[in-house]
Structure formats: structure tokens, C-alpha cells
């Protein structure tokens, strides 16, 4: 069935100091383009290398961290921006930046090829979506069997005391995956029910990680039986031979759009526009589809190996305006309640 994408017009901590800065040199006269991103670090080289095949005169300098850290850094730098482009950031974060007047509007060439719910409806557009990532639960089948744990089928199952000390999930203050989880639980269960669910989940939680991929990686390595993460990370771990089962909770799963923007005031506007144009090209979209089952290019998405077949049907009708408008309050409440178990 058609996935309902409910977009509207409208991921400066010490962790950022450790963010990886990856530069891909091309020619001595290349324009240096500083690009903030929350995309997995292992995927960045192939994107830059493919881009540079067509545009060797633009040198991408990646600054990478989790969604929450990147978002906080951008907001802190609002009056003295350091990035030219943000590429691979949550839709709710981009909407906040738009409301703060931080974006340079630009409509990339070829935008007519995209689903119109994947880009800002203003003209020119302020933000454009690339793909969507979806929450899932990674279960190490060997570990749950060894510990005598039942296989969970729902979010509510994870509140059973039998799982105490066996769960790991991302901290929503640093992780976009963690925030989409919390936002989706509040939408699915209501505000009172959502916090009650998280209170019960917290009792079973071993710890909260900095990144969204870490819980699934830890489950794959056997360091925890169960990690709340996202489906692609589980699929990649399973493809590498890990004893992982990707569980799609029966109540539904949260998800987020990943997209890109140009930062207002950049001195490298033409290079930034070139990257925007390339980022919605068929070549780029085919690369995204290698790891994401949902991409913004119309009619392109193909099944991803090891993705559960029911995943897309379980994606909730997400209220991104709710997520963007309430982000600060949600994160403050979460931190007050649960931060004692964070890395």
C-alpha cells in the first residue's frame, strides 16, 4: 500500500568535539564544502567518491555525528554558521532550522522526479528528502535462547520484567533514532500512555547509547540480547552473518525522513547547489536504495535484503509537525526521567 508521508510546510556537546572530520581531496583548486551529516560514517566515502566522479572541483569535508548532536551544534552556530550544507539529517530537525530562518532556499534540478511529500512545499524549497529510515528491534537469537528469554512481538512485550537488564536503546538527545522512537510512542500511546510505557521500559533498560546504530551492533556482537535500533542496521548485521532477528513490533513503528539543506550565508553557494542537484539524481537515489527501502525518487524503491516484508505496512502515519514543535520539551522530560542510565 502507499506509505502515508505526513509532512508539513512548516539528530554543543563534548561528543561533537570527537566527531569525525573526513576530507576527500580532489584538485588543488577545489572548492572546500563543509557538510554536516548524520549518515553512517562507513557510507560517507562512497558517496563522496561517486559525487567527485562528476564534480572533481568540489572537495567535501564531512563533519559527522549523531542527529541530536548535529542538530544542537547547528542551532548553537545559528549566528555564526560553520557548515555550508547539511546532508543526511532528520526531517524534524530541518523543519526546526527552517523556522529559525537558518536555511537558503533552493529547488534542485529534477525535483519533479520526487514524491512531493518528500520536499518543502514552499517555492523555492528550503529542504528536500532523500529517504526514510524505520525503527525496529534487533534480537540476537543465540543470546535470547541462552538466557531463556521469549521472542518479543510488540513494544509492550519489552516491558515484561523478564527482560530486565537485557535491553539497550539510543538516547534521544543525541540520536535521531532514539527521538523517532520516543516521538512515535507518544503518538501511538498518547502522552500519558507514552510516558507510562517508557517508565516501564526504563525498568528493563540496561543502558542508553549515544548513537542509533549502537544497540543493533551490540546485539549483533552478543553484548546484549535485544537492541532497539533501526531496520537497515539490523539488515546489514544480518547480511554480515550475525544471528539477528529483526522484529517489527505489532503496534507499529516510527520512522524519519532523511534530507538535505543549504545553510543561509554560505560563501560556497554554487558548490552547495551542485551537491543538491546531484543528491536527487538517479545515481544518488540508487545508492540510497541500497540501504533504505523508502526513497524519495518516484517509482525507484526496491526491496532491501533482509528487511522484514511487513515493515512498510507497520510504519505509522507520522506527525512531523508534532515532533518538530515539541522536540525541546520531549527531550527535557526524557532526560529528567531516564538519563541516569545513559552512556
Regions found by a protein language model. Give the residues of each.
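Short, polar/charged alpha-helical segment
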Residues: 37-61, 75, 137
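A ligand-binding cleft/hinge motif common to bilobed small-molecule-binding domains
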Residues: 92-96, 220, 224-243
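Extracellular/periplasmic bilobal clamshell ligand-binding domains
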Residues: 304-343
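A bilobed periplasmic-binding-protein/Venus flytrap-type ligand-binding module shared by bacterial periplasmic
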Residues: 138-143, 183-186, 256-268, 287-288
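Extracytoplasmic ligand-binding site segments that recognize negatively charged/polar headgroups
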Residues: 38-45, 68, 82-223
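N-terminal signal peptide c-region/cleavage motif recognized by signal peptidases
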Residues: 25-28
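Periplasmic-binding protein-like
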Residues: 113, 162-170, 197-202, 208-209, 240-264, 279-301, ...
Amino acid at each position: 500500500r502507499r506509505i502515508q508521508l505526513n509532512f508539513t510546510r512548516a539528530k554543543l556537546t563534548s561528543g561533537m568535539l570527537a566527531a569525525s572530520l573526513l576530507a576527500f581531496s580532489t584538485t588543488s583548486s577545489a572548492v572546500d564544502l563543509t557538510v554536516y551529516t548524520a549518515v553512517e560514517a562507513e557510507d560517507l566515502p562512497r558517496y563522496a567518491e561517486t559525487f567527485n566522479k562528476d564534480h572533481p572541483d568540489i572537495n567535501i569535508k564531512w563533519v559527522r555525528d549523531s542527529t541530536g548532536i548535529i542538530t544542537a551544534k547547528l542551532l548553537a552556530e545559528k549566528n555564526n554558521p560553520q557548515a555550508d550544507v547539511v546532508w543526511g539529517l532528520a526531517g524534524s530537525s530541518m523543519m526546526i532550522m527552517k523556522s529559525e530562518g537558518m536555511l537558503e532556499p533552493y529547488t534542485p534540478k529534477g525535483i519533479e522526479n520526487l514524491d512531493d511529500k518528500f520536499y518543502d512545499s514552499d517555492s523555492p524549497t528550503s529542504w528536500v528528502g532523500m529517504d526514510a529510515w524505520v525503527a525496529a528491534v534487533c534480537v540476537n537469537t543465540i543470546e535470547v535462547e541462552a538466557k531463556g528469554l521469549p521472542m518479543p512481538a510488540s513494544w509492550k512485550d519489552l516491558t515484561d520484567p523478564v527482560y530486565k537488564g537485557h535491553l539497550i536503546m539510543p538516547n534521544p538527545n543525541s540520536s535521531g533514532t532514539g527521538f523517532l522512537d520516543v516521538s512515535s510512542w507518544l503518538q501511538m500511546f498518547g502522552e500519558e500512555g507514552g510516558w507510562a510505557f517508557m517508565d516501564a521500559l526504563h525498568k528493563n533498560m540496561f543502558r542508553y547509547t549515544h548513537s542509533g546504530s549502537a544497540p543493533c551492533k551490540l546485539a549483533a556482537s552478543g553484548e546484549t540480547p535485544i537492541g532497539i535500533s533501526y531496520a537497515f542496521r539490523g539488515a546489514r548485521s544480518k547480511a554480515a552473518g550475525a544471528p539477528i532477528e529483526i522484529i517489527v513490533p505489532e503496534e507499529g513503528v516510527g520512522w524519519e525522513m532523511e534530507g538535505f539543506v543549504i545553510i543561509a550565508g554560505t560563501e560556497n553557494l554554487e558548490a552547495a547547489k551542485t551537491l543538491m542537484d546531484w543528491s536527487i539524481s538517479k545515481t544518488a537515489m540508487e545508492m540510497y536504495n541500497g540501504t533504505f527501502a523508502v526513497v524519495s525518487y518516484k517509482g525507484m524503491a526496491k526491496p532491501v535484503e533482509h528487511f522484514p516484508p511487513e515493515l512498510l505496512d507497520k510504519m505509522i502515519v507520522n506527525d512531523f509537525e508534532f515532533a518538530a514543535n515539541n522536540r525541546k520539551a520531549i527531550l527535557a522530560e526524557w532526560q529528567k526521567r531516564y538519563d541516569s542510565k545513559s552512556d
